[in-house]
Amino acid sequence: EKGGHDGEIKIGKFCLITPGVRIVSAESIVIGDACMIAHGAYISDADWHGIYDRAKPVGNTRPVVFEDNVWIGDSAIICKGVTIGKNSIIGAGAVVTKDVPPNSVYAGNPAILVKKLENKEFNTRANFLADPIQLAKDFDALDRYSLGGNSLFGWLKSLIMPDKSN
């Protein structure tokens, strides 16, 4: 507890939060199921100091909510008091200061509506991860594809006589 504030962060199932994401809370941040947050994104529910009283810790706070299947682009900033609606996308580098309705794409500084998404079924991370046996098969197939053409001879050659091709 700092300055009388207990921050709380709740993260739903099947979320992808990449390295370099900062989520800081003095009040409440709720991230729904199957959300994706890209590198460098910053999410905060507080000002962290007052405008005129910069010695006072935390400042104003308002909860942040991501509904299910939200995608936050690289280096986006989500400010206090924002709710991002289900299936919405926030573009890379966007600064979001106001609520984003469901099925919307917002980008820019300040973030504005770029596109309305069709109201149809989304294939989410929850679908992708629902069947672990199929997921393992998919990863095996991906490994076979990525490593195709590799051989023991090629590996030994790369150790003994490396060139630009390896």
Question: Which residue stretches match the model-derived regions?
Answer:
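C-terminal segments of enzyme domains that contribute to small-molecule binding surfaces
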Residues: 7-13, 56-79, 109-166
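Flexible, glycine/small-residue-enriched loop-and-beta-strand segment within the central core
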Residues: 1-82, 117-118
